[in-house]
Amino acid sequence: METTTITSILDDNNNNNNNNNNNNNNNNNNNNNNNNNNNNNNNNNYNYKEWDNEMVCKWLHDTKRIQKVSIEIFKANEITGNYLESLTDKMLLKMGLTIRDLLSFRSEFDDLKNIFNETNLYNNIQKNSIDYSIDNNNLNNLNNNNNNNNNNNNNNNNNNNNNNNNNNKTIKAPTIDISQYVFIKQMKGSVNCSLEKYINKKTKERILIKRIGKSNINEETIINEISILCSIDHPNIIKTYGYYKDENYYYVASKFYPKGSIKTKSKSTPYNEINAKKVFGKVLKAIDYLHSLDPPIIHRDINSDNILFDENDEPILIDFGLSYKELKDDNNNDDDNYDNHNHNHNHNHNHNHDNDNDNDTNVKIKTQCMEPRWPSPEIHREPPHFSKESDIFSFGCTLFEILGYIITTPIIILPSIPSGMSLECQILFNETTKIDSCFRPTSKQLLNFSWFKETALLTSSEPQPLEPQPQPKPQTSQSKPKPSSSLSSSELPPQPPLESQSKPKPSQSKTQPTQPQSKLNPSSPPSSSSSSLSEPPKPQPSQSKPKPSSSLSSEPPPLEPQPKPQTSQSKPKPSSSLSSSEPPPLEPQPTQSSKPQPSQSKPQPIQSQPTQPQPTQPKSSKQQPQSKQQQQQQQQQQQQQQQQQQQQQQQQKSKPEQSKSKPEQSQSKPQPGQPLQSPSKPQPIPSTTKTTTTTTTTTTPNNNNNNNNNNNNNNNNNNNNIITSINLIECFKKNNSKIIISKDMEFDNPYEKTLHEKHLLKLGISDCKQININHKYFKKVLSFLNSHLTSALQMKMGPYQVDIAPEFDNIFKTLFISLVLEKIDKDTLLKGGKDLGDTSSTLILYTFYYFLSNTLIYQIILHKPTSFKLVGKLK
């Protein structure tokens, strides 16, 4: 009995164990069926050592962190899975990976190795557990419980996923009753996607409604857009009221802002840094709010048209979302001044950049709409990469635009920072417009910049003193005496009467007998000249005052004991500079400097009694300057005629003849004896010796000024003629503004020649051609390329020294000329250098293409050369 019972119990236990094992196997099979993807990844996908090149490229693409350019480099070098561990940083940089892709590759590969090691450990543990499960019933029971729990968890996860998918289609945004609104007009758009204006029947409130066709875009993306737009709550972001849908369209309602954009406001009232700081500080807070959401929202097209003002003059950031990308500007006229919304631009936000569906929709919609006004360099990659850093780039360009330093044209070149900008603003612009997005600050970091703080108000007002600089009155009084003293000290005598006028004006403001006399003087300038000739004693006292001034100008010590003449001399000096064109009266006066020395005692008692002699002196003093004004006009006309004659004579004369004229100039100064006869004689007799002396003296300063201007222009031209490491400019100079392209160019090896011939054939250039290029246009583009090409190559190649290959020079020549001739369009330009040669030259060629596309040089070259303008400060 005992044996039977024991055997029966053992048999029962064995049967139970077999049943449990069968159940476990069934459960495992079910789990395997439910999780085929995970098991395949654990068994096959994560075994990277057995991957071929195609699997490696697929893995890099699935990471969504590595650019397509780097994936093509892995594909071109035929890197398989067993080589992944042996790739060092130096090798990756030489291959052409950027620093960002290198870091992304390292992090992704570390995760891959960890998963691979974990799967191996799991498989080993599972094998060991199977071995021990034959003898251990407890382990079987535990496995059964674990498998049951896993099944329940899988079922729960599936149910949750189904519930989430169903919930995603429900919009949380409030609905609006479209019947309560009356259609006014369609502002922008087409039949399938448009921007319309409505007004409420009761409240008369105007709203904007975006009408989006369901057939144009995926319904789930529209639902996500509307739900997230309605959830945004920020005082500086456009308010979305709700939505309405019918069988064919979605209607999204938002607030209407009639005050217009900051672009139109800046045209009427230009912004300085203090005012711009208040506006853009709030705009930056709105951007930071969008970037801090989970998932973050990326605006994608921040510009001056998308910053509006509400009724309280608060800035409002508008127009973002995938559903608005297809809006096109069909109606250019807008009666209600709302054309500044510009919803036709490409303003989008990316809720989750890690999803394939989102990226696909972004790329598709990107091809159907206009490009952003201020696109960052990474947007022009294939595929375009939008990120938070692209918003920072657009923000910096918009700020620079509102301050008046960028011309708002489709051609974009980042200019050199002007000197009038404050240091804090220069730092902000430099940081926000970095070529590599990795080095741009975040929105939170920008808010901590010194330019946005109150302490920067003093420094931000530094560029404003550029406007009040033109102050002619105070500056001329001080700046003009310097040239007068440098030219000759004899210019002072004819101007002291102005001193007597200038003195009584501040001292005796009530007595103004001079004003009626000034009206009479214009009618009697010749009489004054005749009276001055007939009455020698009168001009002597008038000239006696300046003569000590002339002696004072030559002798500084007597200036100290006479404070009054010093003040009087400071005022006539500007007039002397004005009368610098009058050489004849200036030269004869030093000859009389010996005579009026006793007359110096006369003006002193006159100064002691200013009440009596002053009314008599200003009469003669006013007559003289007025007569001088006419004389100046006459002399200027004579000088112009004489200059023309001299120019003709100089062309005919030889150099020794010009040397003879120099001693005549040296002798002309002591010859003139009468100061007042010289201006009267040159009128009827332009060919006398005295006139020749005057012409030589008058033309020399003008010639010097012309020479100085010419020298300055030459210096500016020399600054533009920058010789670079590229031999293109030298070739350009040797061929007299022409570049010769031929198939017989010299090459170091046959590979370069074949590569060059392939490129020429691709461009359609089979014979030798001589092509004319605008010199200024060519020089500006090359100077810009030279300043940024090295940095772009270093960014692409890594922190190593970049040596431009000789084939790069030749291909650069043909490429530039082909772009000017419009032999290459934008699409072929962005393909890269992979079609022009082998992998050894692909890197350097692609770098050049990449640089051109990122800096938007192709937009300049593909346009007409006349449309090319250097960016500068708006006037």
Swiss-Prot record:
Q: Where are the transmembrane segments?
A: 842-862
At which positions is ATP bound?
187-195, 210
Where do Polar residues bias regions lie? 1-12
- EC number of this enzyme: 2.7.11.1
Q: Name one GO molecular function term.
A: ATP binding
- Where are stretches of biased composition, namely Pro residues? 555-564
Q: Where in the cell is it found?
A: Membrane
* Protein kinase domain mapped to chain residues: 181-452
UniProt biased composition (Basic and acidic residues): 654-663
Its chief place of residence is: membrane
What is the protein's membrane topology class?
A: Single-pass membrane protein
Where is the segment annotated Disordered? 1-47, 136-170, 331-362, 461-718
Active-site residues, Swiss-Prot/TrEMBL:
301 (proton acceptor)
Keywords of the record, alphabetical order, are: ATP-binding, Coiled coil, Kinase, Membrane, Nucleotide-binding, Serine/threonine-protein kinase, Transferase, Transmembrane, Transmembrane helix
Which CDD domains does the UniProt entry name for this protein? PKc
**What SUPFAM superfamilies does this protein map onto?**
Protein kinase-like (PK-like), SAM/Pointed domain
- Residues of the SAM domain: 51-116
**Which regions are flagged for Low complexity bias?**
13-45, 136-168, 474-554, 565-581, 589-611, 617-653, 664-718
Please give the catalytic activity noted in the UniProt record. Answer: L-seryl-[protein] + ATP = O-phospho-L-seryl-[protein] + ADP + H(+); L-threonyl-[protein] + ATP = O-phospho-L-threonyl-[protein] + ADP + H(+)
**Family membership:** Belongs to the protein kinase superfamily. Ser/Thr protein kinase family.
Quote the PANTHER family the UniProt record gives. Answer: GATA ZINC FINGER DOMAIN-CONTAINING PROTEIN 4-RELATED, LIM ZINC-BINDING DOMAIN-CONTAINING PROTEIN-RELATED
Supply the name of the protein.
Probable serine/threonine-protein kinase samkC
Task: Give me the gene this protein comes from.
Answer: samkC
